[in-house]
């Protein structure tokens, strides 16, 4: 993942965003938009970390990993799917084949919202064979799952359609997400307003959140929303390009994307990427950011 600084500082970034928003919408429009946004719930550590503990247990009983083509990955998919099914999501498995093994992407749709304007939020669920992948990327998967469950618990009625995804075989080269995107029709691609990707959301020693900047589409509303969310809490951010994770699959298909990462933790792609490799506070903050921004984007009337 190539990191580059696109703004000299948070203060300037916040000022630029404020000026941009002021120019793009009049006072009345802004007031209406703000009035429509329901208050986002706050997520606790107890609503996120149990999912990571579950993924650790799955790895422990399956040779220490949750890699593509293994029982560990299949059980990880089953765990997430079961939680979503109980919450009222419409779930489906989308199979693909890589290196002679069948894998599944898990797709979950929340009923309602404009099907011509989809907010797609995702993370890869697989690990490398060398370790359990609890930060890379159990942390992103758990944050997305906790967000989806908050949608259900709150009974959110979004303006846009909400879809969540957990990708397989990312560690082999973005295979699952590439397979999914390649099978979308042109019309289905255009229905996705933005794809939000989260890879490594709980890294230890995190000092700043790395927010995805989409060079193809410029500063998306999602990027603006994430940077504003963090700025309001005096949390530093750093712009990164689209690449190195599943948002690249969408970028290659000219689908707008954003999201964030907390960078590489103390251990990556080894057996030490276990539960101890995740900082619960960072993981919870990441999940709160996803919830807060998703609530904002979901309540925004689609631009026709």
Predicted regions and their residues:
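Metal-dependent peptidase/peptidase-like ectodomains
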Residues: 167-265
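A non-catalytic alpha/beta surface segment that caps or lines the substrate-entry region
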Residues: 53, 57-111
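N-terminal capping segment at the start of a domain
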Residues: 34-71, 126, 196, 200-203, ...
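Second-shell loop/turn segments in exported
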Residues: 36-43, 61-72, 90, 95-97, ...
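Extracytoplasmic/secreted proteins, especially bacterial periplasmic and envelope-associated proteins
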Residues: 38, 47-50, 54, 71-91, ...
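His/Asp/Glu-rich mid-to-C-terminal helical/loop segments that flank catalytic regions of hydrolases
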Residues: 266-304
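Alpha-helical metal-binding/catalytic segments enriched in His/Glu/Asp
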Residues: 121, 125-174, 290
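Secretory targeting and sorting signals
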Residues: 1-33
């Amino acid at each position: 993942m190539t990191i580059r600084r696109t703004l000299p500082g948070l203060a300037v970034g916040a000022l630029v965003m404020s000026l941009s928003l002021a120019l793009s919408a009049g006072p009345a429009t802004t007031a209406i938009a703000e009035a429509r946004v329901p208050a986002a719930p706050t997520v606790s550590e107890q609503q996120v970390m149990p999912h990571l503990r579950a993924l650790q247990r799955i790895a422990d009983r399956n040779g220490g990993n949750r890699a593509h083509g293994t029982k560990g990955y299949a059980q990880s998919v089953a765990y997430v799917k079961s939680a979503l099914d109980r919450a009222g999501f419409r779930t489906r498995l989308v199979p693909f084949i890589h290196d002679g093994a069948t894998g599944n992407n898990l797709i979950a749709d929340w009923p309602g919202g404009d099907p011509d304007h989809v907010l797609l939020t995702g993370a890869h669920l697989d690990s490398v064979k060398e370790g359990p992948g609890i930060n890379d990327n159990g942390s992103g998967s758990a944050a997305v799952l906790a967000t989806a469950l908050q949608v259900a618990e709150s009974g959110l009625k979004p303006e846009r359609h909400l879809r969540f995804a957990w990708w397989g075989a990312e560690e082999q080269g973005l295979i699952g997400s590439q397979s999914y995107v390649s099978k979308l029709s042109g019309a289905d691609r255009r229905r996705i307003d933005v794809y939000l990707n989260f890879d490594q959301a709980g890294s230890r020693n995190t000092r700043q959140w790395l927010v995805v900047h989409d060079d193809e589409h410029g500063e998306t509303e999602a990027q603006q929303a994430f940077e504003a969310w963090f700025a309001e809490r005096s949390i530093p951010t750093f712009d990164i390009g689209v690449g190195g994770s599943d948002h690249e699959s969408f970028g290659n298909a000219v689908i707008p994307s954003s999201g964030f990462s907390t960078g590489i933790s103390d251990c990556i792609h080894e057996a030490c990427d276990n539960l101890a490799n995740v900082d619960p506070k960072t993981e919870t903050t990441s999940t709160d950011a996803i919830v807060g921004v998703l609530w904002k984007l979901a309540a925004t009337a689609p631009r026709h």
